[in-house]
Amino acid sequence: MRRSLAPSQRLGVRIKSKDAFTPPLQKKNKRVCQEELQKRQSALRDATNRVELPLPIRFTANSEYEQAIAKVLARKFKVPIANYVPDYGGNRTLGVRRTIVRRALHDPQACNALVLYVPPAYTEHERMSMDPSKVQVHVVVDPILSNVLRPHQREGVRFMYECVEGKRGNFNGCIMADEMGLGKTLQCVTLTWTLLRQSPDCKPTISKAIIVSPSSLVKNWEKEFTKWLHGRMHCLAMEGGSKEDTTRALEQFAMNTATRCGTPVLLISYETFRLYAHILCKTEVGMVICDEGHRLKNSDNLTYQALMGLKTKRRVLLSGTPIQNDLTEYFSLVNFVNPEMLGTAADFKRNFENSILRGQNADSTDAERQRALQKTQELIGLVNQCIIRRTNQILTKYLPVKFEMVVCVKLTPVQLQIYTNFLKSDQVRRSLADCNEKASLTALADITTLKKLCNHPDLIYEKIAAKEKGFENSQNVLPPNYKPKDVNPELSGKFMLLDFMLAAIRANSDDKVVLISNYTQTLDLFEQLARKRKYTYVRLDGTMTIKKRSKVVDRFNDPSTDCFLFMLSSKAGGCGLNLIGANRLFMFDPDWNPANDEQAMARVWRDGQKKPCYIYRLVASGSIEEKILQRQTHKKSLSSTIIDNNESSEKHFTRDDLKDLFSFEANVLSDTHNKLKCKRCFQDVQRQPPAENTDCTSHLSQWFHCSNNRGLPDSILSQAWTASKCVSFVFHHRSQAESKPAAITEDDESEQQQQSPKRTSKNDDNDEDFDPENSAEEQFLGF
């Protein structure tokens, strides 16, 4: 007979947790020590709000007093540095500091580890006898960065680290001269992060770093640090702001001398640095990095002198363009990063420059030429210790194929008449007759006028309307219904071709297009054409603020936006911008300096690009633009050694220069092709293709030559050639065989998905065609 009710039969009675029924067979006797341990753990959880944290000591929390002590010791340790993110993630608790064995911050034996420093191999006896605080450890790049670095980037990081740490010689500076698109920014982010966190002595190598760049790239540097480090470090980006705010921020940065800073990296433009150099030069800085460092080729300008006053021995100079083959500029760049490597300017002139230049003279003796060669090799041997350069052919493994085309476009009858009338005028005759410095400046203005005319007559309409010298009768050449503010593509051969090609691209693909010109007036015409054809567009020139530039670029690169055209001034944004949202680029007019055009044309074929790229360089057939192209080709074909043997040191044009520049070949398909004296072509028709080992970096003579639209790699250009009837000749080549990108490994593809993303003037925001102070543009070469 049942004497008691089962728990489920006891209606209305709720069993409390302490009275919970336990079957006799399942009941276990707990040991006293286990009960005591559970009480301690329960008390600790209650005291710490159920946050279980490791404790540095053991204690019994069975009273209010000991619970209070437990709460103190279990409290998280807060780093007493504003904005500082510790390496361990901030999960440590308070307690007595424990003695630990020194070890590297990251595992040097881990997969894909990039080890920058290997300590001496100590024996056990040496370790026992050594002071533990003096044992050196490995310097290993943070895995978050080393896992995304490509082989050439790993090599670059190691090279820069060895240079700034004095491992490669008695110097602490270097020049990173990689071509555009090879990830110089990522390499510098890696170097900076490593030096700020590690050293062989288990402490930061540097406490602060300054990165100086063109104003348009300050925000880009901040984005790159955030992107690759995922918010682990805060940067002070100086863009905009009042003078008072800027002064206060820079003074706080300069006065912070702690080993670990909450904001250890200052991002600042060249112009701002020059204005506030008196603040930044007061205290020592661990390292300075100068982006677009070719701006420092003139040691006499104020920016160069201000940066030289910075108290730091670690100097890194970045330049995506080849170092100009001029000894004075070469000395300035090397002297900036390593002031004692080549001695003073007088020492350099005596030891190298005089001998090398003497050997270049036409009347030099064999002994002088031999000595010049010896000095050249000696100089190369010295500077190669601190310079690393790789070409963008490395990118062919990671990026889609790039097709580059030089399109020779015929002038329209209106352009042709105005052009020839100007060449026959007294204005040009006087320039040819008198070649002094004043006449050369006048010739520069005339050359700029002709370049603008090749773009569109609208660009020189004010001169025509005012009947300036050389344009007295040009008003009669314009059509009767001509309106200067209403763009008419039919008056310009290049605009006709552009109009046809944009229409074909818009109708047949979803490609986006970048339009680049040296003149804001040409950008104005681009805008008028875009509004006329109902194309969506954005524009970036020297008038746009830095903050707005970043928003415009992000908007254009967003694949979800229907922004068809990006109009860019090469002087204001030709360097550093990442425009991978587009895969077609028009270089509407050439620059005297080939490096400037190379910088501008590198905006789309960069890391993160997924589509084949098409680069179109438009030049007016037989005109001054072809003369400029010929000089570019000659400069690019020169051996990249110390000095350009044919470079003129004069600061003005010679009479032969002007005669060539002011000549015009009216009835040729391409004056450039004629001067190449191509042996692969017969009567302007290619009979033999270029060698298989050539690509778009080869000389123009090794490109494909087309006098008709057959064989073109781009169907859009082929259609426009037939429709516009204004193309006369095309040079074209590609970056690599189209099958190469398919050979990318899965690791490379994964790495490429993680990664995404240079004007030589003194002020990148100065949107004009010619800078008289830029000697690279004043010196011209024969073809």
UniProtKB/Swiss-Prot annotation:
Q: Which GO terms describe its molecular function?
A: ATP binding; ATP hydrolysis activity; ATP-dependent chromatin remodeler activity; DNA binding; DNA translocase activity; helicase activity
Q: Which UniProt keywords apply?
A: ATP-binding, Cell cycle, Cell division, DNA damage, DNA repair, DNA-binding, Helicase, Hydrolase, Meiosis, Mitosis, Nucleotide-binding, Nucleus, Phosphoprotein
Q: Where in the cell is it found?
A: Nucleus
**What SMART domains does the record point to?**
DEXDc, HELICc
* GO cellular component terms, A-Z: nucleus
Q: Where does ATP bind?
A: D178, E179, M180, G181, L182, G183, K184, T185
Renumbered residue ranges of the record's region Required for chromatin remodeling, strand pairing activities and coupling of ATPase activity: 2-9
Q: Which residues carry this modification: Phosphothreonine?
A: T22
Q: Which residues form the Helicase ATP-binding domain?
A: 165-340
- Which portions of the sequence form the region Disordered? 737-783
What top-tier enzyme class does this entry carry? hydrolase
Q: What top-level branch of life does the organism fall under?
A: Eukaryota
Q: Which residues form the Helicase C-terminal domain?
A: 497-654
Q: Share an example GO biological-process annotation for this protein.
A: cell division
Compositional bias of kind Acidic residues: 765-776
Q: Which PANTHER family match?
A: DNA EXCISION REPAIR PROTEIN ERCC-6-RELATED, SNF2/RAD54 FAMILY MEMBER
Q: How does it assemble?
A: Interacts (via N-terminus) with spn-A/Rad51.
The entry's function note states: Involved in mitotic DNA repair and meiotic recombination. Functions in the recombinational DNA repair pathway. Essential for interhomolog gene conversion (GC), but may have a less important role in intersister GC than spn-A/Rad51. In the presence of DNA, spn-A/Rad51 enhances the ATPase activity of okr/Rad54.
The record's comment on protein family reads:
Belongs to the SNF2/RAD54 helicase family.
Report what the protein is called: DNA repair and recombination protein RAD54-like
